C-alpha cells in the first residue's frame, strides 16, 4: 500500500481523527464521507479495530505502508522500553515530523515538501530525506536561500505553541529536538497496543 496522497480532510473523517492537528476536518462533519456517512460507523471486528488504529497512526505521520512496517520491525529490535512506544518514538524522530513540531510547517505533509525541496538543514547540512532520523540536540534550520519563503514564514507566525520536547528560535528559524517525548506528550488518541497486536499477527 503506497502513501496516501488524496484529500486529508476526507481521510480524517474516514478515520475519525484529525490529521492536520487543527481538528478542522472534523469540526463540521464528524462522520465518514459518503452519502450514508452519518449512519455508517459500523461495529468493527477485533482485526478491524487493530487495522483502523494502525491506519490512524500511519496517516497521522503520512508514511507509506512498507516504510511503516519496516519501522515497526526496527522498533521490535530495540531491547529497552515498550515496543509500541518505541515505534512511536521512531516516527516522532523523522525529520519531516520534527520540522512540523518546530512550527516550520503547518502540517506534516507540508513539512515533507519543505524537506524534499531542500529548504531544511540539519547541523548546517542540507538533508532532503523526510525519513532522516533526528537525534536530540541536532540543530534543524532553514537554509539561507529559503529564509524568506512565504509558506515557511506564515507557518512560523501561525504556530501558537510548541511541544515541551523541542526548542525554537523564531528569529533564526532554527530549533532542535531537545529530548525524546514522554508517552503522554504525543498522540494520546492512539492505542498503540492494538497496532502491536496487528503486526504480531502479520509478521
From Swiss-Prot:
InterPro entries according to UniProt: Ribosomal_uS4, Ribosomal_uS4_bac-type, Ribosomal_uS4_CS, Ribosomal_uS4_N, S4_RNA-bd, S4_RNA-bd_sf
An example Gene Ontology CC term for this record: small ribosomal subunit
Pfam family, one: Ribosomal_S4
Origin: domain of life: Bacteria
Gene3D superfamilies documented for this protein: Ribosomal Protein S4 Delta 41, Chain A, domain 1 (1.10.1050.10), RNA-binding S4 domain (3.10.290.10)
Keywords linked to the UniProt accession: Ribonucleoprotein, Ribosomal protein, RNA-binding, rRNA-binding
A Gene Ontology BP annotation from the UniProt entry: ribosomal small subunit biogenesis
GO MF entries: rRNA binding; structural constituent of ribosome
Domain S4 RNA-binding: 93-156
SUPFAM superfamilies membership: Alpha-L RNA-binding motif
HAMAP family for this protein: Ribosomal_uS4_B
Family statement: Belongs to the universal ribosomal protein uS4 family.
Subunit details: Part of the 30S ribosomal subunit. Contacts protein S5. The interaction surface between S4 and S5 is involved in control of translational fidelity.
Described function: One of the primary rRNA binding proteins, it binds directly to 16S rRNA where it nucleates assembly of the body of the 30S subunit. With S5 and S12 plays an important role in translational accuracy.
Protein name: Small ribosomal subunit protein uS4
Organism: Streptococcus sanguinis (strain SK36)
Amino acid at each position: 500500500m503506497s502513501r496516501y496522497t488524496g484529500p486529508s480532510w476526507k481521510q480524517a473523517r474516514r478515520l475519525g481523527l484529525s490529521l492536520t492537528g487543527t481538528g478542522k476536518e472534523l469540526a463540521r462533519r464528524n462522520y465518514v464521507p459518503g452519502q450514508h456517512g452519518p449512519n455508517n460507523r459500523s461495529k468493527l471486528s477485533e482485526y478491524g479495530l487493530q487495522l483502523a488504529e494502525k491506519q490512524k497512526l500511519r496517516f497521522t505521520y503520512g508514511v507509506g505502508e512498507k516504510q511503516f512496517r519496516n519501522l515497526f520491525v526496527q522498533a521490535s529490535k530495540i531491547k529497552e522500553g515498550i515496543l509500541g512506544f518505541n515505534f512511536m518514538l521512531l516516527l516522532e524522530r523523522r525529520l519531516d515530523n520534527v520540522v512540523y513540531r518546530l512550527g516550520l510547517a503547518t502540517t506534516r505533509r507540508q513539512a515533507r515538501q519543505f524537506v524534499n525541496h531542500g529548504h531544511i538543514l540539519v547541523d548546517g547540512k542540507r538533508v532532503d530525506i523526510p525519513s532522516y532520523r533526528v537525534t536530540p540536540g541536532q540543530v534543524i534550520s532553514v537554509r539561507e536561500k529559503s529564509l524568506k519563503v512565504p509558506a515557511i514564514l506564515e507557518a512560523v507566525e501561525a504556530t501558537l505553541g510548541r511541544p515541551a520536547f523541542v526548542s525554537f528560535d523564531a528569529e533564526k528559524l532554527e530549533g532542535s529536538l531537545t529530548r525524546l517525548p514522554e508517552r503522554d506528550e504525543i498522540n494520546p488518541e492512539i492505542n498503540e497496543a492494538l497496532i502491536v497486536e496487528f503486526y504480531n499477527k502479520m509478521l
